[in-house]
Regions:
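Residue-level detector of family-conserved "landmark" positions at structurally sensitive sites
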Residues: 24-25, 118, 158, 258, ...
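Acidic, amphipathic alpha-helical patches
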Residues: 72-75, 144, 211
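Conserved phosphate-binding/catalytic region of the ribokinase-like
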Residues: 106-110, 166-280
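Short, hinge-like loop/turn segments at secondary-structure boundaries
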Residues: 13-16, 40-43, 132-137, 172-174, ...
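Conserved beta-alpha-beta core of the PfkB/ribokinase-like small-molecule kinase fold
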Residues: 84-174, 182, 190-191
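Conserved N-terminal subdomain of the carbohydrate kinase-like
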Residues: 1-89, 272-280
Length: 280
């Protein structure tokens, strides 16, 4: 993040949420990226651009491999206690940040940390990048698709599956990738299709008429899914997988019932209580 007011506010919030900041990088020559989000009458969000910056790039475009290398012993210690390394694909729009995430993949592999990728296709980030604005859409898709070969777990939306794989079958998507990852495909309020641990299925997720803001719903879904994967160790049958997906769906829904991508994120306990109420 940039050493600006937004960066400072995030640090305050991270501290309040007890987020480990050991590897947080602050840069004086770039800005914290502030995303402009608009909503329609149904609460569905779309990204309309970014707040103007006085710098030539945003801080997330210059995530430094060298700074992480200086903390390599701390990183190894952290990875010894880590089950999943989670990333999106936006970092690939900058070669500097891309180099860093590939370095982290190397370290994760050494310590058997699994990689979770949320495809999270956001073309506006590429369009506004001084590094990649001139790269064609086809080339962007190719770069991201190659990146997905590092995934042990892949989460993507239905429209992303169509764009990157030309179909929405999670089993076939898994078979097209190097590590044959577990694949979860979301589709808004519609059922989730998945291929997990050699099993394939479709799971209904809870819906509501009171949707306020869908910003952050995908992140909450993935956070809920990962927390359940950790609690199970690894789901071994269809019932356990469906439980993971339903809990993830609850987390996504709860985030949609109020404004904002952070404030509405539910706790594990809140998600569990909500799911129990639905079942009963």
């Amino acid at each position: 993040m940039g050493s600006d007011d937004y960066g400072k506010r995030f640090i305050t919030q991270f501290n309040e949420l007890d987020v480990n900041l050991d590897f947080l990088q602050l840069d004086n020559d770039s800005s914290t990226r502030v995303v402009n989000v608009d909503r329609d009458q149904f609460g569905d969000r779309f990204f309309s651009g970014f707040e103007e910056s006085s710098h030539s790039c945003f801080a997330d475009e210059i995530l430094s491999k060298k700074l992480i290398e200086k903390e390599i012993l701390n990183l190894e210690k952290t990875f010894l206690e880590t089950k999943y390394l989670v990333t999106g694909t936006i970092l690939l729009s900058s070669p500097i940040s891309a180099e860093t995430i590939f370095f982290l993949f190397e370290q994760a592999k050494k310590l058997e940390v699994k990689v979770v990728i949320d495809l999270n296709w956001r073309e506006v980030f590429w369009d506004h990048s001084s590094f990649s604005s001139k790269i064609s859409k086809d080339q962007r898709v190719k770069i991201i698709k190659n990146f997905l070969n590092h995934a042990h777990v892949l989460k993507l939306a239905k429209e992303e599956a169509t764009l990157f794989f030309e179909h929405e079958n999670p089993l076939l998507i898994s078979q097209q990738l190097l590590k044959q990852p577990d694949v979860i495909i979301t589709d808004g309020k519609n059922p989730v299709s998945w291929y997990f641990n050699g099993l394939q299925g479709i799971t209904e997720t809870p819906t509501s008429q009171k949707i306020v803001d869908t910003t952050g719903a995908g992140d909450a879904f993935l956070a809920g899914l990962i927390s359940k994967l950790i609690s199970y160790g690894y789901p071994s049958n269809k019932l356990e997988i469906e439980d993971c997906v339903k809990f993830a769906g609850v987390c996504g829904l709860l985030t949609c019932l109020g404004e904002g991508a952070i404030e509405q994120q539910p706790s594990y306990e809140k998600g569990t209580r909500f799911l129990e109420c639905l079942i009963s």
